[in-house]
Amino acid sequence: MSIAHIVDWRLYVVTDAGLSRGRSHRAVIEAAIVGGATVVQYREKHASTRQMIEEALELRDLTRRAGVPLIVNDRVDVALAVDADGVHVGQDDMPVALARRLIGNKLLGVSAHNLSEALQAVRDGADYLGVGPIFATTTKPDAAAPIGLDGLRAIRQHVSIPIVAIGGINQANAADVMRAGADGIAVVSAVVAADDVTAAARQLRALVSVTQEKAL
């Protein structure tokens, strides 16, 4: 049985070595957790497998002590090696159904850019969706065209599993994203590249929480 519906998805922080301004993943995530990060995704596209395992183990130690789920992007082998809480796969990564067979009951997130991809991910066994990009983003140069708040609403109307919105989300638009139906926001540069990571995370967490409370 999936634990996705009891996970606090409000502030999902994704690592990015290229944006962290020379700070280690550990330093950035430690500060983000202090600021209120509720989920952490380890995303590393350029390191060796050995380095990824070493870095993910460090994050696993941090997140476990904080009670925050650790998700590994794409690499099922790394997630299993460090006993992460889950894996997140994109449309060009390992097929969702195969990832599910390999990871068992761990959390499985899937990126979706439109309703068709979202519905297929649900059928294949996704626990949650990473929907976007909502807005234009410079974090992923190869990102698809933004789907906007209307695209997010359309997916929300047809799926019941948790949705984490991603892509160009920051302090100026986080509340709008939550009002459009997201269960949480996934952020990269808005936290990882901030001068004060803890303060940036705290501000975003507060915005998301207030918006959720008003919706109840």
UniProtKB/Swiss-Prot annotation:
Example GO biological process: thiamine diphosphate biosynthetic process
UniProt pathway annotation: Cofactor biosynthesis; thiamine diphosphate biosynthesis; thiamine phosphate from 4-amino-2-methyl-5-diphosphomethylpyrimidine and 4-methyl-5-(2-phosphoethyl)-thiazole: step 1/1
Keyword Magnesium in record: yes
Alphabetical keyword list: Magnesium, Metal-binding, Thiamine biosynthesis, Transferase
Binding site for Mg(2+): D74, D93
Amino acids binding 2-[(2R,5Z)-2-carboxy-4-methylthiazol-5(2H)-ylidene]ethyl phosphate: T137, T138, T139, G168, V188, S189
MF-aspect GO terms: magnesium ion binding; thiamine-phosphate diphosphorylase activity
Cofactor list: Mg(2+)
InterPro entries xref list: Aldolase_TIM (IPR013785), ThiamineP_synth_sf (IPR036206), ThiamineP_synth_TenI (IPR022998), TMP_synthase (IPR034291)
Keyword Metal-binding included in the entry's annotation: yes
Domain of life of the native organism: Bacteria
An annotated GO cellular component: cytoplasm
Cofactor binding description: Binds 1 Mg(2+) ion per subunit.
Sequence positions that bind 4-amino-2-methyl-5-(diphosphooxymethyl)pyrimidine: Q41, Y42, R43, E44, K45, N73, S111, K140
Function text: Condenses 4-methyl-5-(beta-hydroxyethyl)thiazole monophosphate (THZ-P) and 2-methyl-4-amino-5-hydroxymethyl pyrimidine pyrophosphate (HMP-PP) to form thiamine monophosphate (TMP).
PANTHER family: THIAMINE-PHOSPHATE PYROPHOSPHORYLASE, THIAMINE-PHOSPHATE SYNTHASE
Family per similarity comment: Belongs to the thiamine-phosphate synthase family.
Protein name: Thiamine-phosphate synthase
Organism annotation: Chloroflexus aurantiacus (strain ATCC 29366 / DSM 635 / J-10-fl)
